[in-house]
A protein has these predicted regions:
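C-terminal motif of bacterial Sec signal peptides marking the signal peptidase cleavage site
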Residues: 22-25
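C-terminal/domain-edge helix-coil "capping" segments
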Residues: 27-59, 163-254
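Sec-dependent N-terminal signal peptides
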Residues: 17-18
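Surface-exposed short loop/turn segments
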Residues: 113-182, 202, 253-254
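Second-shell loop/turn segments in exported
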Residues: 59, 86-98, 114-117, 162-163, ...
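N-terminal segment of the mature soluble domain
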Residues: 64-131
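Bacterial N-terminal signal peptides that target proteins for export
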Residues: 2-13
């Protein structure tokens, strides 16, 4: 059996992070990059997100969230970037599952912000539309094999650090827009992508767990945003409360 000291330094660091991750557990994490699909049409005012923000984000500086108390949530749609994308080849039952999870994620986030869910536009109503642009289940047996046999993924270490995702793990990407339900004015929009982490899913039957955990991450972050905007009026995400150590762990962990 190889000693930890016999591995190259980058691999040693990842092995140590992996051992920590196995002990404390970890869910989905943010990917390093994401492609814009055109669903939101105008991306000219988007900026790169920082901290716990989405990868790309737009916040209307003139918007006052406190004037809104209700929300309309459109049906979440799926839009693959190419005909050969996992979304295009996905079974109908899985497509319905993703759309349901997406809508439920938005619903839970809005309820955390104490918004009333309605079906008609109004002066105090915001409208939310969202699209799932990527969703791919994990190949769980291969992903978990990398935990018990580090040599399986040693060759992928440098690639994994560079992209933020190891092979065989699940992934989820999407776009969201919040607008005034009457005028259509854009108040907030974001494009983001999250991926699974090694050790977050130990059940070989639960191939969609990485995606489910991605939705949970979005639910928690958007819920935090909506609760804050009801108090401050701004759609800006509250300050990232993670320690520098946790941020480094999230960035480097497989």
């Amino acid at each position: 059996m190889r000693k930890l000291s016999n591995y190259p330094l980058p691999v040693t660091v990842i092995l140590m992070l992996l051992l920590t991750q196995i002990i404390v557990g970890c869910g989905a994490k943010q990917y390093r990059r994401v492609e814009q699909t055109g669903y939101l049409e105008d991306y000219s005012e988007f900026v790169a997100g920082k901290g716990n923000e989405a990868l790309y984000v737009y916040v209307n500086p003139q918007a006052d969230c406190r004037k809104y108390t209700k929300v309309m949530i459109d049906k979440v749609v799926l839009m693959g970037k190419a005909k050969d994308s996992p979304l295009a080849a996905m079974e109908l039952k899985d497509q319905k599952m993703l759309a349901t999870l997406g809508w439920g994620t938005i619903y839970d986030a809005m309820r955390k912000g104490q918004f009333e869910i309605v079906s008609e536009p109004g002066a105090d109503v915001i409208r939310v539309k969202a699209v799932i642009t990527e969703a791919d289940k994990a190949i769980v047996i291969l992903a978990d094999a990398m935990m018990v046999a580090p040599y399986v993924w040693e060759a992928a270490t440098v690639w994994g650090i560079g992209t933020g995702k190891w092979p065989f793990l699940g992934e989820l990407a999407g776009e969201i827009e919040i607008s005034d339900s009457q005028t259509g004015e854009r108040l907030f929009a974001a494009v983001d992508k999250v991926v699974g982490t090694i050790g977050s899913n130990m059940d070989p039957r639960a191939k969609w767990d990485d995606v489910r955990q991605g939705f949970e991450r979005w639910r928690d972050l958007h819920g935090k945003r909506m609760a804050s905007c009801r108090a401050t009026g701004s759609f800006v995400m509250p300050a990232d409360e993670r320690s520098w150590m946790q941020k480094s762990f999230d960035y480097l962990s497989p």
